[in-house]
Amino acid sequence: MSNLLVFDNSVVTDEALVANIMAQNQGASHQLLERIGTQVQLPANTYASIQVFTKSPQPVTLPASLLETLSGALAPGGALFGAVDGSQVMDFIMAGLAQDGDKWVKPAATGTTLLKKSGGGPKKFAFKRASPATAAPSTNGTNPAATVNLNSVVTLSMDDDDLMDEDDLMEDDTNLSMPIKIPAKCDPGPGKKRRKACKDCTCGLKEMEEQAKDAQLAAQNTVTLSAEDTAEIDFTVQGKTGGCGSCALGDAFRCDGCPYLGLPPFKPGEAVSIGGASDL
C-alpha cells in the first residue's frame, strides 16, 4: 500500500517546498486538495496514510464530502493526519474515522464467525437421579464426608410435553349453580337485617347479593299487561284508537291487517258493519 500527499494551493506555489516534501516521502503519490472529488477520483481502500500539507499557520478545514472521499481512499487501518482541523470531530466520526492521538484512523474490518447448530432440533434437558456418592472431605480434615440422601433428590424431565387443558381445572356447571352456604358468623339470624358483604368477601354472601340484584333487575324489566291493555280495541267508539289511530280515515291510512280495509271512511261512534254483520 502506498502513501498519499495532499497539497493545498499555498504549497504548490512554492516549488522548493514541494521538492523538499517529495524528497522526504519517496515513492508517495501526491494530489492537489482542490482537485480531489471534482477532477480526480481516488481509488478506494488503497492508501496506508494520507497527509495534508499547507503553508498557512491555520489548519485546513475539510468539507464533510471531502472527508468521506479521503476516508474511502484509506485502506482499513490507514490514517489521515497533517494540517487538518482537529475541531472537526463530528465530521471525522461521521466519515468513519476514529481519533488516535493526532491521527484519524480508519478502523480495520473484523471477520464475522457464524455459529452452526449441531443436531436437527432443540435439545431437551433432563435431570436424572444422582448415583450414590459422597462429598469430598473438607481441606482441614475435621469434617466427615457427607452422604447424599437419594430420597431427597428430585428427578425432572422435559421430555414430557403434555400440557394441561385449563378448562379441565374448572368444575362442572352443575357445581357452579349449587346453593351458596353462608357461614354462621355472617348470618344475623331470624328477624335481623343481614349485613352487607365484606369488600374481600370469600364466604359467598357477595354472590348471594349479586343474585338478588340480578333477580330484581329481571323483575323490573318484565312488562305485565292488564285485561284493559289486552282487550280488543273498538275503533267505532269515541276515544278508542288503534296502533295507528287512522282507521276511520279510510284505506289510505289503514294498516295491512286492519279489519276495516275496503270500508269507506267513517266517524267515531258510527255503527260499522263488516261482512254484512253489525259490530254493535
UniProtKB/Swiss-Prot annotation:
InterPro entries: Anamorsin, CIAPIN1, Dre2_N. Residues 186-203 are annotated as: Fe-S binding site A. GO terms for molecular function: 2 iron, 2 sulfur cluster binding; 4 iron, 4 sulfur cluster binding; electron transfer activity; metal ion binding. Residues 122-176 are annotated as: Linker. A motif (Cx2C motif 2) lies at residues 255-258. Its main location: cytoplasm. It holds the Pfam family DRE2_N. Keywords: 2Fe-2S, 4Fe-4S, Cytoplasm, Iron, Iron-sulfur, Metal-binding, Mitochondrion. Its cofactor is [2Fe-2S] cluster; [4Fe-4S] cluster. GO terms for biological process: cellular response to oxidative stress; iron-sulfur cluster assembly; negative regulation of hydrogen peroxide-mediated programmed cell death; negative regulation of nitric oxide biosynthetic process. [4Fe-4S] cluster binds at C244, C247, C255, C258. It is found in: Cytoplasm; Mitochondrion intermembrane space. Transmembrane segments: none annotated. Residues 1-121 are annotated as: N-terminal SAM-like domain. [2Fe-2S] cluster binds at C186, C198, C201, C203. A motif (Cx2C motif 1) lies at residues 244-247. The keyword 4Fe-4S applies. Residues 244-258 are annotated as: Fe-S binding site B. PANTHER family: ANAMORSIN. Belongs to the anamorsin family. The C-terminal domain binds 2 Fe-S clusters but is otherwise mostly in an intrinsically disordered conformation. The N-terminal domain has structural similarity with S-adenosyl-L-methionine-dependent methyltransferases, but does not bind S-adenosyl-L-methionine. It is required for correct assembly of the 2 Fe-S clusters. Monomer. Interacts with TAH18. Interacts with MIA40. Component of the cytosolic iron-sulfur (Fe-S) protein assembly (CIA) machinery required for the maturation of extramitochondrial Fe-S proteins. Part of an electron transfer chain functioning in an early step of cytosolic Fe-S biogenesis, facilitating the de novo assembly of a [4Fe-4S] cluster on the scaffold complex CFD1-NBP35. Electrons are transferred to DRE2 from NADPH via the FAD- and FMN-containing protein TAH18. This is Fe-S cluster assembly protein DRE2. It comes from Yarrowia lipolytica (strain CLIB 122 / E 150). The gene is DRE2.
